[in-house]
Regions:
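C-terminal cap/linker of serine protease catalytic domains
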Residues: 1-24, 184-245
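Conserved active-site neighborhood of the chymotrypsin/trypsin-like protease fold
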Residues: 7-12, 39-41, 53, 58-140, ...
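A short, Trp-centered hydrophobic/proline-enriched beta-strand micro-motif
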Residues: 26-43, 131
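Short, glycine-anchored, charge-dense loop/turn motifs used at functional sites
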Residues: 32, 62-64, 180-184
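Gly/Ser-enriched beta-turn/beta-hairpin loop segments
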Residues: 41-49, 93-100, 148-163, 195-198, ...
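Active-site loop architecture of trypsin-fold serine endopeptidases
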Residues: 46, 75-77, 112, 133-144, ...
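PDZ/PDZ-like domain segments forming the peptide/carboxylate-binding groove
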Residues: 55, 167-171, 175-176, 236-245
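Structured segments of extracytoplasmic/periplasmic soluble domains
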Residues: 81, 132, 148, 215-222
Length: 245
């Protein structure tokens, strides 16, 4: 099994239980590490690597884990590191390229509480949240929602209302965004940089959890959503010397 990640979160960024109205440690206990091995000849191997590591979160008591899809796409081997110290094998249930969500089934009894799925639409900019990777408090960042807006990726990816949080989590892939009520409101996808008043600020882009319920049953049963693919126009533009090419 490849080595699991070490988040290395500064204590000054870690959440404190007294700052939240829910049981922080119980919520963090649902977050797991996700480690995968992908064949060298896989389509995504050159871009994403053959050994991948990130996080996921238990969303059902039977061991279903929600994560970000790029960790598990084309994976042949999956390991889940649980909050009680156990490491169990997993199996990829499904992946949705449109949202970026991936599902993994633990292949052993988990016996840990799942994190309740919340409503990302109810969370506004300024809300106090926790972006949690595996490892309990030492793997989590106390953050705030700094924006909700459209996000478009050049790899044919579009979210109508992505969530942006700061400060940034250094191990963002598959991290659980825990809302003010202690429920799951999103999954970490990217780390971005923006300039504000002459200074660079790092933030995370989160896939909102409201995109999951409409496709969850399809992911569980057939591995992908039962819907037509989104059409894309094949144009790629960049700015060079104040001109668009």
């Amino acid at each position: 099994m490849p080595p699991q990640m070490n988040p290395q979160i500064s204590e000054t960024l870690q959440p404190r239980p007294e700052d939240y109205a829910y049981d922080l440690d119980q919520a963090l206990g649902a977050v797991v590490s996700v480690t995968t091995i992908v064949p060298e000849d896989a389509f995504t191997a050159d871009i994403l690597g053959t050994e991948r590591a990130g996080s996921g979160v238990l969303i059902r008591s039977d061991g279903v884990v929600l994560t970000i899809g790029y960790l598990v796409t084309e994976a042949e081997t999956v390991w889940l590191g649980l909050s009680d110290g156990r490491t169990v094998p997993g199996h990829v249930l499904g992946y949705d390229q449109t949202t970026g969500f991936g599902l993994v089934q633990a292949l052993a009894r988990v016996d840990l509480p799942a994190l309740k799925i919340g409503q990302s639409s109810s969370v506004e900019p300024g809300a106090s949240v926790v972006l949690a990777g595996a490892g309990g408090r030492s793997g989590a960042v106390a953050a705030r929602v700094i924006g909700k807006q459209e996000f478009a990726g050049y790899w044919e990816y579009l979210l109508d209302e992505a969530i942006f949080t700061a400060p940034a989590h250094p191990q963002w892939g598959g991290a659980a965004l825990i809302g003010p009520a202690g429920d799951l409101i999103g999954i970490g996808s990217l780390r971005l940089e923006q300039s504000s008043e002459g200074e660079d600020e790092h933030l995370n882009m989160i896939v909102p959890i409201d995109l999951l319920p409409p496709i969850l049953e399809d992911l569980l049963t057939v591995g992908r959503p039962n819907r037509p693919p989104r059409p894309w126009l094949g144009v790629y533009a960049v700015e060079i010397d104040d001109n668009v090419v």
